[in-house]
């Protein structure tokens, strides 16, 4: 037998079941095919395309549902008696529409592209090194295009005037509107960083607090700014309504400043290494409780004797 034949035989035997049962053939190990959605080192064209599709579909689904609900609330005669959208029923309806829409959209597409659905949120993720700068740009383009598509679709499917565009109300100035948008966006982005980026046992439920934070932002800001906190949402509605007020820039500058503010707070916590101290405090508390429980058990045993 030649040396080549013996080598082939050796290779064949190395792939047999080590237990020797029925000489079962064990196929060679296959390369890992699943990729980390937020791994910066993977910037292949295919990965970017998948992320772009996921962000487009998620953002479109989120904003189309929210736009239509917002249009219904603003056309309802019973809800528009109060000036500038300050009727409680109107506020709650709009807030629920946006909060629940982003919640189920994130749950659907978080496993595809991360489910940012918001350029401001994408910027926070990029600053936190959860996504690469290239991926951030890809997400931005998909989200902005999806926002305009959702606005056009909602406008075409619903009769009457487009009433889901952002505008200042209740005498709110541009400066106040800028800071309201900034802090509203910061709360939303910080919620994302603390519940989705931080490694916790409750990461799978991140969509719930994110939806709640957007709900709260709409209750707080709608009467004053119309609640942008998402440049794709503001631009898509403005294009559909063909209404670009001279202060439209606050829905971009304010939200981007808010995303930077949220990242700054998150980064400060990382510098302080809060997880180490929180873990140590929990361990000390657990140890103290165990000691007290042991002392109680000893006292009970002595009393019985």
From Swiss-Prot:
Region (Disordered): 1-34, 286-305
Gene3D superfamilies linked: Glycerol uptake facilitator protein
SUPFAM superfamilies per record: Aquaporin-like
GO BP annotations, alphabetical order: ascospore formation; transmembrane transport; water transport
Top-level lineage group: Eukaryota
Residue spans, topological domain Cytoplasmic: 1-48, 113-136, 198-203, 270-305
One GO cellular component, as annotated: plasma membrane
Broad class of the protein's primary localization: endoplasmic reticulum
Extracellular domain ranges by topology: 70-91, 158-176, 225-248
Domain notes per entry: Aquaporins contain two tandem repeats each containing three membrane-spanning domains and a pore-forming loop with the signature motif Asn-Pro-Ala (NPA).
Protein name: Aquaporin-1
Gene: AQY1
């Amino acid at each position: 037998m030649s040396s080549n034949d013996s080598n082939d035989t050796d290779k064949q035997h190395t792939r047999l079941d080590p237990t020797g049962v029925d000489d079962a053939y064990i196929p060679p190990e296959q390369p890992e095919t699943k990729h980390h959605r937020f791994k910066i080192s993977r910037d292949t064209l295919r990965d970017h395309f998948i992320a772009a599709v996921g962000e487009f579909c998620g953002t479109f689904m989120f904003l189309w549902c929210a736009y239509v609900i917002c249009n219904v609330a603003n056309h309802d005669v019973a809800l528009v008696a109060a000036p500038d959208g300050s009727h409680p029923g109107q506020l709650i309806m709009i807030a629920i529409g946006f909060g629940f829409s982003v919640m189920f959209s994130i749950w659907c597409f978080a496993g595809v592209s991360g489910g940012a659905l918001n350029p401001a949120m994408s910027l926070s993720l990029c600053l936190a090194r959860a996504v690469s700068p290239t991926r951030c740009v890809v997400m931005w383009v998909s989200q902005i295009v999806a926002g305009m598509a959702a606005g056009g679709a909602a406008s075409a499917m619903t009769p009457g005037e487009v009433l889901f565009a952002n505008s200042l109300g209740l005498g709110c100035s541009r400066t106040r509107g800028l800071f309201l948008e900034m802090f509203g966006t910061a709360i939303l982005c910080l919620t994302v960083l603390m519940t989705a980026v931080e490694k916790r046992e409750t990461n799978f439920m991140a969509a719930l607090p994110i939806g709640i934070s957007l709900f709260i932002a709409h209750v707080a800001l709608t009467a004053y700014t119309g609640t942008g906190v998402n440049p794709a949402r503001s631009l898509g509605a403005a294009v559909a309504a063909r209404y670009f007020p001279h202060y439209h820039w606050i829905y971009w500058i304010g939200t981007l400043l808010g995303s930077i503010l949220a990242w700054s707070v998150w980064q400060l916590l990382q510098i302080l290494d809060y997880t180490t101290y929180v873990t140590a405090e929990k361990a000390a508390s657990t140890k103290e409780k165990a000691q007290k429980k042991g002392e109680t058990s000893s006292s009970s045993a002595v009393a019985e004797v």
